[in-house]
Amino acid sequence: MFLNPFKRDSFGYNLLIKRSVIFVFGLITWYRFFRINSMRIVGADKLRDLPQQGVLFVSNHQTYFADVSAMYQVFNAAENKRYNSVPFLTLFRPKLNVYFIAAAETMKKGILPKLMQYAGSVSIKRTWREAGKNVNRSVDPKDIENIKRAMESGWTITFPQGTTRPFVKGRRGTVHLIKELKPVVVPVVIDGFRRAFDKTGLFVKSNGNLLN
């Protein structure tokens, strides 16, 4: 399908560049998910009935980037009407109106996270922690506006735990967002990524794991 080289998404990102970034990262992660490890997908057939905007995926969190990359893979496959499997060719026609909420400080750590911002990051300032230290600050209204813009534009992923540590309770901010914006909420459970990848999700830690 021809893509207008000048068209931009709701955050001003050029869609042709965005598509290229998603493809390159998808190429790398597809091999890691489906060849170095194996990934089992359950329930993706429900994606076919979702609207194109106003959907919030609420997931647990095991790595900074592998989790969200896996969801992008599943959404790309669904865009090509493939459910519960991710054929390699679906990388060539990714879903472009997907966004993920991430801590601003995480997205500034190195060139790869900065590139991943182009894939659809909605970077926000954490109100409880920064640079490894506890903080206590008010929510930035601009962050709420950006999240609202993402939801109005497409599908949005959030990790309410706000950390990759296991068994941490989700932050109340997600509940407030749901009450205010009233999106279609889709719960997601992931597993196996902590065993397979390091904390960032950029480096493989072990092979042959089952990812869910």
PLM feature spans:
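Internal catalytic-core helix/loop-beta-alpha segment
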Residues: 122-167
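A transmembrane-helix-recognition feature enriched in membrane-embedded lipid enzymes
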Residues: 1-42, 70, 110-119
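A cross-family acyltransferase "interaction/gating" segment
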Residues: 152-157, 162-212
